[in-house]
Structure formats: C-alpha cells, structure tokens
From Swiss-Prot:
Protein name per the record: Uncharacterized protein encoded by LINC01587
Gene Ontology BP term (one): nervous system development
Expression (tissue specificity): Expressed in neuroblastoma.
Top-level taxonomy: Eukaryota, Metazoa, Chordata, Craniata, Vertebrata
C-alpha cells in the first residue's frame, strides 16, 4: 500500500490524523527504540492539542476519541523501562 496515496485519499482531518499516526506507529514499531516511543507520544500530544483547536469548545466531541487515544499510548509512564527490558530479554535468550 502506498502510504502517501492513502493519506491524500483521506479528506477528513480527524481521519487523516489517525491514518498518519497508524502508519507512523507501524513504521516506528519495527525499531522499538526509546526515541521512537517518545516521538509517538509527542505526536499523540500534538494530535490532542490540534483536535481541541479544531473543535473549539465542543466538549463531547473533544472527550470521545482523544481520551481513548491518550489512554492507549500513555499507559506506561516510563516507556524506557519496557523497551530496555524487552531488549535485554531478547539478548539473554
């Protein structure tokens, strides 16, 4: 699948953000480095901020997807521990 074509095909800004995030998460997930996790968390933070700017004061729309999105990507307060643990386990096996 051509990533650029898929992104340009999506006209809705909300869907476009999640489409871009999906492709980035798949791409960076292959490496699984601490830098990549922080980048993904930063992208998620930017997405929530821009969504609020787009929706203005629409509280119900603001609280549906962004909160769920935040929970799915910030469940681990210290991603470096998980990443280093995964790497060390793979090395020892």
């Amino acid at each position: 699948m051509d990533t650029q074509k898929q992104i340009h095909k999506t006209h809705n800004s909300k869907n476009q953000f999640f489409t871009i995030f999906f492709f980035l998460s798949v791409e960076f997930g292959k490496e699984g480095t601490r830098k990549n996790f922080y980048l993904l968390l930063s992208i998620g933070h930017y997405g929530r901020k821009s969504r609020r700017a787009d929706l203005g004061t629409a509280d119900t729309a603001d609280k549906t997807e962004p909160e769920c999105f935040a929970a799915s990507w910030t469940f681990d307060p210290n991603p470096s521990v998980t990443v280093s643990g995964a790497h060390s386990t793979a090395v020892h096996q």
